[in-house]
Each structure stands twice: as structure tokens, then as C-alpha cells.
Amino acid sequence: MIGSITGNVEEIRDSYIILNVGNIGYIIYVSHKVLQTCKVGDNIKLYIETYVNRDNITQLYGFLNRQEQDYLKMLVTINGINYKTALSILSKLSPEQIFSAVVNNDKIAFKGNGIGEKLAGRIITELQYKINKMPIEETFSIIENDDSLAALISLGYEKLKAFNVIQEIKSKTPDASTQEVIRKALQKLSQ
């Protein structure tokens, strides 16, 4: 298994790059976001997910950060989502945008590239469960500095439910202190 690869970008293609590591060129499939940030000659580090397809061909999928890698792993566990489809979702949406789409039940965010309404609904349903099970340190910038959310999660509330309640409170009272947000959230969650 390969955890990460650091090397020089030798070629950039439509859906992959060739990364030269010790004079060996590795074909690594990446999202369009990664393709846009790379230039030939750049020295980059990619976190690698290895997949062996039906034809017994090993394919490498590369990510600039662990969040995208973790989301690919979650997405491919959903029935109807393969590595190519998961990578197309990550080309379109960042982990933060996926989280937001799941929280807001936004099926439209996932639709396209072979994903219809039924599969988009399944993605949301299954990711709600998986996101709630993620360790708190694996959450993202949209929630990582939120003390009120951390407090509710430490009290045993589900991450998505707590996030929704806090967002609602903050939209109604944007100047509320952390203590006020927690107090209002506890009242709302205990109803």
C-alpha cells in the first residue's frame, strides 16, 4: 500500500497526472481541482488511495489533503458510487461543500455526472450517518473553530443536528455570545 507520494509533475492529462518519483512515472488520478493547481515541473505531495479494478489493474488516486481522501473513502462505500464517480463529486464539491449539502439535504449539489435524484438522496442519507461517526478532529474549517458546536458534541448531541441548530441560532442572532448560543441550542435540542 502507498500512503503518499512526493515527486515532480511530469505530465498533466484530462483526469490524471504523471508524477515522476525516482525516475518512475506514476499515473495518479486526481480531481479537477488538483489538475488546476498543478503545473508541469511542480514538486507536490499527494495522499494516495489505491484501488484494484475489475480487470485487476491497480489505480492510484491522489489528494492534496486528507479530508478529500477521507471523503472519497466514504463516498465509495455508498452503493452506486465507484471511484470515478466519487472523484467527479470531489472535482465539483470540496469536503466543506459536501458537508454543507448533507446538512441542508441539498440533492441538487450532487446531481450530474451520472448521479440522479435517487442516488443523490442515497448519498445524503448515508453520509449523514457517516459524518456523525467521524471523529471531531476530522471536521473542517466551517466548524472547527466553533466552541458552541464542540460543547454540544461533547455533551453527546449528533454533529449534524447540533450544527443545524447552531446555524439557525446564529442566523437569527449573529451577535450572540458562545454562552448564549449554547443556552439557546440546549433549549431547542431538549424540546
From Swiss-Prot:
Q: Where is this region: Domain III?
A: 146-191
Whichever gene encodes this chain, its name is: ruvA
The answer, when asked if DNA damage is one of the entry's keywords, is yes
Keywords assigned by UniProt, alphabetized:
Cytoplasm, DNA damage, DNA recombination, DNA repair, DNA-binding
- Fetch the InterPro entries from UniProt: DNA_helicase_Holl-junc_RuvA_I, NA-bd_OB-fold, RuvA, RuvA_2-like, RuvA_C, RuvA_C_sf
Q: Where is this region: Domain II?
A: 65-142
Q: Which domain of life is it from?
A: Bacteria
Q: What are the GO BP annotations of this UniProt entry?
A: DNA recombination; DNA repair
Q: How does it assemble?
A: Homotetramer. Forms an RuvA(8)-RuvB(12)-Holliday junction (HJ) complex. HJ DNA is sandwiched between 2 RuvA tetramers; dsDNA enters through RuvA and exits via RuvB. An RuvB hexamer assembles on each DNA strand where it exits the tetramer. Each RuvB hexamer is contacted by two RuvA subunits (via domain III) on 2 adjacent RuvB subunits; this complex drives branch migration. In the full resolvosome a probable DNA-RuvA(4)-RuvB(12)-RuvC(2) complex forms which resolves the HJ.
Where is this gene product found?
Cytoplasm
Q: Which GO terms describe its molecular function?
A: ATP binding; four-way junction DNA binding; four-way junction helicase activity
Region (Flexible linker) residue ranges read: 143-146
Function in brief: The RuvA-RuvB-RuvC complex processes Holliday junction (HJ) DNA during genetic recombination and DNA repair, while the RuvA-RuvB complex plays an important role in the rescue of blocked DNA replication forks via replication fork reversal (RFR). RuvA specifically binds to HJ cruciform DNA, conferring on it an open structure. The RuvB hexamer acts as an ATP-dependent pump, pulling dsDNA into and through the RuvAB complex. HJ branch migration allows RuvC to scan DNA until it finds its consensus sequence, where it cleaves and resolves the cruciform DNA.
Family to which this protein belongs: Belongs to the RuvA family.
- Region Domain I, as annotated, extends over 1-64
Q: Which GO terms describe its cellular component?
A: cytoplasm; Holliday junction helicase complex; Holliday junction resolvase complex
Any domain commentary?
Has three domains with a flexible linker between the domains II and III and assumes an 'L' shape. Domain III is highly mobile and contacts RuvB.
Its organism's taxonomic lineage begins at: Bacteria, Pseudomonadati, Pseudomonadota, Alphaproteobacteria, Rickettsiales
Q: Name one Pfam family in it.
A: HHH_5
Q: What is this protein called?
A: Holliday junction branch migration complex subunit RuvA
Record organism: Ehrlichia ruminantium (strain Welgevonden)
